[in-house]
Amino acid sequence: MTSHGGGEVRGERIHTVQPERDLVANWEVDLSEKLEEYLLKICSGEITGNEEDGQIPVNFAEAALLLQGSVQVYSKKVEYLYNLVLRTLEFLSKQRDQEQSKGTSNENEASSSRQVDEEENDLFWNVDDIPVDTKNRLDSSVGGDTCPSQFVKPPANLVVLEGDCLDTSGDGGELESYLLATTHLYRDFILLDPCDAVAVNEFLGDNYGGKGRNSAHRGSSVRKSFHSSVGRSGGSARKSSVGKNQGTNVHLSPICGNGPNDQNCDQGSQPPVFEDNDHGFDMDNEYGGAMDFSDTDADEDDPWKPLNPYEPGKLKVKPFKKVKILKKIGWSITKDHMTSMFPLARPNGPISSELIEIWKMHGCASKDEQASQDIPYYEKLREMLVNGGNQPCGANGNYNDNDKDNHDEANNGDFHDFGEHDGDDAEHPFMDEDVLNMNDGGAAEFHNYDGFENGESNCQESLEDLCRSHLDALLANIAKSEKQTDLAARVSTWKQKIEQNLEEQELHPPFDIQEYGDRIINKLTVEESGNVETFTDLMKDQEKHEVARAFSALLQLVNNGDVDLEKPGNSTNEPMCYTAVKPFSVRLLKVHNRKNEKRGIHLPQKRAKSPITKGKSHESPPPKKRNTCSVSSQTRKVSLKISKINGVGVRCTPNSKKRRKGRSDDVTEVTEVASIEKSLGKL
């Protein structure tokens, strides 16, 4: 870029930046510095000369073009750099390919020697000649094939039991404290409690089902090794897993010595089988005898042997924690106790069995009285529902069913009396183990006693109550609907008429009472009948809504004093009904009265002040110019004042002081009336 003008002296001439045509010269120009100088000169006001003095004024269009050209120059620089980088990379890649093609022959020679060295090294790592030990082979059926779906949980009883040789003061991690030296393995697990065998089988599944005789013998040895740790524990392994493993049933095959066929027992073919059923933890075999895991010393190794309460234990004694007792527990216990002592009353009938007959007789008598009256249909339906579909009792109190002792009054049909028997009745036990009999399939068979039907009776009674309430609600709705049918029909017809009238009213133009009043007055002035016309002639050929609007406007005109209504044939002023045959007439009053009333309506006059004032001199008002329009209004004011004055003179006050003052006021009032009359005479 070049500078225009003398660049040696700064103050004589201003340097202006001009674009360079040569691309090589653009690399040497510091464009940012030039622009900063140019902007500084513009802001300082140095560019203020004329062209005659040799200074060029500021040309903003030229400056904008200069900026645009500088952007293009920079973009060209970036493009040149990009092309240069691409060509350099291409040259380097071609040179590398040539070097690789030349070096392939040398690499082949070097690789052959390298392979020989690798073969020599592989001979050192060859282990095919080493014999394989069969004992070191892992069981693939347990360890390799199956993978646990969750983390392994340690056995619950792998803890120190009471009575073990545990030194609490020393190291608690010794093997002797956990009795690991005296226990045996069961399916690769150390068991301190035989009940944990169920958890082991559940964890491993049925993977041992297809194993050979060795695993079977191992399973049969469980019977001997289950109680090895209990001997030293002093019977402290009594804790059962019944609470933890509820729903688990252990069905064992008949062990030799317990079943009837001891010779046919094969220990190597049938390992103990553990199944998961929902029958609880069953410790009995299928022959009714108790299962004994030990061989001879069953009494010594009994895990369920109770502890000696007088033998002190070696574990640390923890203090008892205070627990808040919930009130609900005590309340439920007391409630159950009270219900057992005092049975609940039945919904139908007395509690005491001695009063049942009397209650039945009263019930039949009341039914006879009701039967004498007219029973509605819904009452008959309800009575049939209460009686279970049978007819009600007769007048003599006899029921349709012959059995009176086992039936209730509310259940004359097939419903039995479920609350008849007391809790002390030995003939009808509620829950007795002797009642249960086993059928051929092994299921418990219950006899159909009345005591077992209490739940069914409650269900039946609740169903009856529900049906009664539903029937009552249904009948009430039917009665309401019957009453509301006529009213609903009338309301619907009225609603239709009103909606039609409202739609018609919306189509009519808005009501202007002044416009309708002007129409009536215009008709009365045009007629030649002396400003008197009947209302039927005025409303001839008019619609209903127009007649109603005109009548309301007529009433407003009467109130304003523009027109007057004449009632022919009514001298006594009694109320009469005027029709089109016998109409009333409308008389138009003076036109100027109507105009004055209009003016009075639009501009209401102020209320005239009372002339009775204290401490003021009553002077006559100043004379005014004559105005014919204000004569009537002034006469009205005068009459109003006179009436007020007369009213004040007649008024009586209870106080004597006010009477004396009233006499002096009467004199002033008389003088004021005289002055008002004189002023009116002058007008």
From Swiss-Prot:
Keyword terms, alphabetized: Chromosome, DNA condensation, Nucleus
Alphabetized InterPro entries for the sequence: CNDH2_C (IPR031737), H2_M (IPR031719), H2_N (IPR009378), Ncaph2 (IPR031739), ScpA-like_C (IPR023093)
GO biological process assignments: chromosome condensation; DNA damage response; positive regulation of DNA repair
The keyword Zinc-finger is annotated on this UniProt entry: no
Compositionally biased spans, kind Basic residues: 214-226
Annotated tissue distribution: Expressed in seedlings, roots, stems, leaves, flower buds and flowers.
Domain of life: Eukaryota
Annotated GO CC locations: condensed chromosome; nucleolus
Disrupted gene: phenotype observed: Enhanced sensitivity to excess boron (B), to zeocin, which induces DNA double-strand breaks (DSBs), and to aphidicolin, which blocks DNA replication, probably due to the accumulation of DSBs. Reduced root length, especially in the presence of genotoxic stressors, with twisted shape, ectopic lateral root formation and dense root hairs, as well as short meristematic zones.
PANTHER family: CONDENSIN-2 COMPLEX SUBUNIT H2
Function noted in UniProt: Regulatory subunit of the condensin-2 complex, a complex that seems to provide chromosomes with an additional level of organization and rigidity and in establishing mitotic chromosome architecture. The condensin-2 complex plays a role in DNA damage repair or in protecting the genome from certain genotoxic stressors (e.g. boron excess, zeocin and aphidicolin).
SUBUNIT field: Component of the condensin-2 complex.
Family recorded in the similarity comment: Belongs to the CND2 H2 (condensin-2 subunit 2) family.
Name of the protein described by the UniProt record: Condensin-2 complex subunit H2
Taxonomic source organism: Arabidopsis thaliana
Gene it is expressed from: CAPH2
